[in-house]
Amino acid sequence: MTFSVTILTIFPEMFPGFLNYSLAGKALEKKIWNLEIVNIRSFAKDKHSTVDDVPYGGGAGMVMRPDVIGNAVDNVLSAHKNTRFIYMTPSGTKFNQRIAKELTEIPHVTILCGRFEGVDQRVIDVYTPYELSIGDYILSGGEPAAMVVLDACIRLLPGVVNNFDSVAEESFSYSGGILEYPQYTRPEQWSRYKVPEVLLSGNHRKISDWRREQSYVRTKERRPELLNGDDK
């Protein structure tokens, strides 16, 4: 099954961006996933292709118009009946590895990238998109956030990462969703620092136990909420 994505944006030239490189780019070439870009401005009705207007009630910034957004969304939904409609917004559910995995199991995903002060609330009320956030900070628009979500999803698709065990052992995927253990490679000694002896022992059980312990310690120190399930 190909993972298909439609992006709604006023800056179509931003895509595929960094998704055209490395693992995601190779997967795009192999058609493991595909990308459709819809320019929201093409659904505007005036000669200036206006997509925003001043907010009712006053306030700073501009708001994306519901009539223009609605026409663009209707166009996509009519072509993709079973799509999962997502809106990138700081007020959405915080994106995590579990959500990334869930999205890869859906054949088609549509992502609306907001700009300015966001979209008119009526768009949210009518289409009830899955509102997603990548963190508690503000970007200039939803496009970078959408790329982050897609990058996390694409690398989970079969055939993208050659050694799929490396994906399964990463942070948030490893041992119940906790942080990954520390990694080491050659040289065995760098400056005054040596690789932990257990990793050189060849004893796979001891190595596995060490990694599990290191993951737990690292998670307890840096992200204790993951141990309590508070970040689900």
From Swiss-Prot:
GO terms for cellular component: cytosol. InterPro entries: Alpha/beta_knot_MTases (IPR029028), tRNA_m1G_MeTrfase_C_sf (IPR023148), tRNA_m1G_MeTrfase_TrmD (IPR002649), tRNA_m1G_MTases_N (IPR029026), tRNA_MeTrfase_TRMD/TRM10 (IPR016009). Coiled coil: none annotated. Pfam families: tRNA_m1G_MT. Keywords: Cytoplasm, Methyltransferase, S-adenosyl-L-methionine, Transferase, tRNA processing. Its main location: cytoplasm. It comes from the Bacteria. One of its GO terms (molecular function) is tRNA (guanine(37)-N1)-methyltransferase activity. Gene3D superfamilies: 3.40.1280.10, tRNA(m1g37)methyltransferase, domain 2 (1.10.1270.20). It is an enzyme of class 2 (transferase). The keyword S-adenosyl-L-methionine applies. It catalyses: guanosine(37) in tRNA + S-adenosyl-L-methionine = N(1)-methylguanosine(37) in tRNA + S-adenosyl-L-homocysteine + H(+). It is found in: Cytoplasm. S-adenosyl-L-methionine binds at residues 114, 134-139. Its EC number is 2.1.1.228. One of its GO terms (biological process) is tRNA N1-guanine methylation. Homodimer. HAMAP family: TrmD (MF_00605). NCBIfam families: PRK00026.1, trmD. Specifically methylates guanosine-37 in various tRNAs. Belongs to the RNA methyltransferase TrmD family. This is tRNA (guanine-N(1)-)-methyltransferase. The lineage of its organism: Bacteria, Pseudomonadati, Pseudomonadota, Alphaproteobacteria, Rickettsiales.
